[in-house]
Swiss-Prot record:
E.C. number: 3.1.3.64
Localization annotation: Membrane
Extent of the signal sequence: 1-16
Organism lineage: Bacteria, Pseudomonadati, Bacteroidota, Bacteroidia, Bacteroidales
Reactions it catalyzes: a 1,2-diacyl-sn-glycero-3-phospho-(1D-myo-inositol-3-phosphate) + H2O = a 1,2-diacyl-sn-glycero-3-phospho-(1D-myo-inositol) + phosphate
Full protein name: Putative phosphatidylinositol-3-phosphatase
The organism of origin for this protein: Bacteroides thetaiotaomicron (strain ATCC 29148 / DSM 2079 / JCM 5827 / CCUG 10774 / NCTC 10582 / VPI-5482 / E50)
Length: 159
């Protein structure tokens, strides 16, 4: 098995969170949530939304590239590749409101994404049929979209 180069490892493992010995996918999603929370306190809310959207787009394409590189070294859809979980959890965070209950929405976004990612309902599992990095990324993107929808509905109902 050949050794992968540094940049695909850095991106694909979610800055190393994928090397967690326990639940690497959850570790990647947790790191992404922590990054988002830090940005929440550092940026004006509109800038946070634009930054989050940019992160989703950038890391989706970078994740496809990194996963393709890493699959050739580590095999198909390696558990250490968690950039997909990072992108997946950033998607529902786009629906988090800027109010005094924002942190409950962050917790809900994280939990809903992990549930959709693990259970893989409503076509999420079918996204894994795509080959290479696209298959690695797209199931988590769809899980993130479903989570986004539920967070948006919760915002509409709860406020």
């Amino acid at each position: 098995m050949k050794r992968p180069s540094f940049l695909p490892v850095l991106i694909g493992t979610g800055f190393g969170s994928g090397f967690s010995p326990f639940a690497p996918g959850t570790a990647g999603a947790l790191l992404a949530s922590i990054i988002w929370i830090a940005l929440y306190f550092l940026l004006p809310f509109t800038a946070l939304l634009w930054t989050t959207a940019a992160l989703v787009v950038l890391f989706t394409f970078a994740g496809i590239w990194a996963a393709n590189k890493l699959e050739s070294c580590w095999g198909e859809d390696p558990s250490r590749v968690v950039v997909d979980e990072m992108v997946g959890v950033w998607i529902p965070l786009l629906a988090v409101p800027d109010n005094d209950r924002w942190y409950w929405y962050v917790i809900a976004a994280f939990a809903l994404f992990r549930i959709f990612d693990i259970v893989k309902p409503l076509g999420v599992r079918k996204m894994e049929n795509f080959k290479g990095g696209v298959g690695v990324m797209m199931d988590d993107v769809l899980a993130g979209v479903y989570s986004f929808i539920l967070i948006a509905v919760a915002r509409w109902v709860i406020g």
